[in-house]
A protein has these predicted regions:
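Iron-sulfur (Fe-S) cluster-binding modules
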Residues: 1-115, 125, 129-131, 303, ...
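Catalytic cores of enzyme domains
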Residues: 102, 111-326
């Protein structure tokens, strides 16, 4: 178990001067709203679409000050030109295309592959994704031995540099897959991080079977845990799609406080919150982002998550399975006892 850190963090004067007067990221994100709506443009979207442009600049500068991080992130913004769409599409079944796309992705930098149909709530308000009804989601695992050095400092940039390297993989892999799809005769558009765009990656990744939402607001995969970055590719290629997978991460988070206790600004809630019509895990933007911006992107919560440590996920899955089986047996015994008492 982690030791609960004393919450002594307070933003510095430069950050406080950059924070827009009266603005709340929680309000923009829809915290407390029980009606369903699309997500609004927010952090890492273009600065003219939300009030936190100056805060984004501080976050970028903080990260660039750490050794090697600037070069690592620069590769993430190297967007290659895509091939034109082949006017004569090849003929395959949806299952065949899905298998071929998966094989291509997993041999071109990606560690995980999933596909789902594009849903309206994946698309950020004010944006459009037209005539591309499917979404391919890709996952990229961190080198945990590097990631665990977050947050970065002026002396140690290993953690932020590792984040930058994985975002660079996101770019390479998503652009390579989109290019391959276009050469097969179908339209495709890549959506890598870290810049935000039209597509919300985590909801699409959950529906594509890549994992569950964790208490820390990041995806938890059954193999790599929270030790992941994501990229997406929208396309009109016909694909068989995957189902959501619930393997126990959500139940685990209900009874775990490690990321919650480790968060310096106390931004991670013990309970789920209502956000745009859904009760789910939510990280307090107004508490998180000051520390995130001043400390090279932070990432403490995913580094301390028990699911992130290599080799741990399998043991956690086995533990969760035993717990569910024990609870099922208890319910059967209770039902039999009630029946016998009648």
């Amino acid at each position: 178990m982690s030791r609960r850190r004393e919450k002594t963090y307070a933003p510095g004067p430069e950050f406080l001067a950059a924070w827009p007067s009266g603005a709340s990221g929680n309000r923009i994100n829809g915290l407390g709203e029980r009606a369903t709506r699309k997500a609004s443009p927010m952090f890492w979207h273009p600065a003219d679409q939300h009030p936190f442009g100056a805060v984004q600049q501080i976050a970028g500068a903080s990260c660039r000050r750490t050794p090697d991080a600037a070069a690592a992130f620069a590769s993430a913004y190297n967007y290659p030109e895509l091939s034109p769409v082949n006017p004569e599409p090849a003929r395959r079944t949806g299952e065949e295309w899905a298998e071929m796309a998966k094989e291509f992705a997993l041999t071109h930098d990606a560690d995980l592959f999933g596909a789902t149909t594009l849903k309206d709530h994946y698309i950020v308000d004010g944006y459009a994704i037209e005539d591309q009804p499917n979404v391919i989601m890709l996952g990229f695992s961190h080198d945990y031995e590097e990631l665990k050095h977050v947050p970065g400092t002026a002396e140690n940039g290993r953690g932020p540099a590792e984040v930058g390297r994985q975002y660079a993989r996101c770019t390479r892999a998503s652009y390579a897959l989109a290019d391959w799809i276009r050469r097969q005769g179908f339209n495709a558009k890549p959506f890598p991080g870290p810049r935000a765009d039209a597509l919300l990656l985590i909801p699409a990744a959950i529906d594509a079977g890549l994992g569950e939402l964790g208490k820390h607001g990041s995806l938890i995969n059954r193999t790599y845990g929270s030790n992941l970055r994501l990229a997406g590719v929208t396309t009109d290629m016909p694909l068989t799609t995957q189902q959501m997978e619930q393997f126990g991460a959500d139940d685990f988070c209900l009874n775990c406080r490690i990321c919650e206790d480790a968060c310096p600004p106390d931004a991670i809630s013990e309970t789920k919150q209502w956000v745009r019509g859904e009760e789910r895990w939510y990280v307090d933007f107004d508490k998180c982002i000051p520390f995130f911006a001043e400390n090279a992107g932070c990432a403490i919560c995913i580094a301390v998550c028990p699911w992130a440590r290599p080799g741990i996920a399998e043991n956690l899955l086995a533990k969760m399975t035993r717990r569910r089986e024990a609870m099922a047996r208890s319910r059967v015994v209770a039902a039999l006892s009630d029946e016998a008492a009648r």
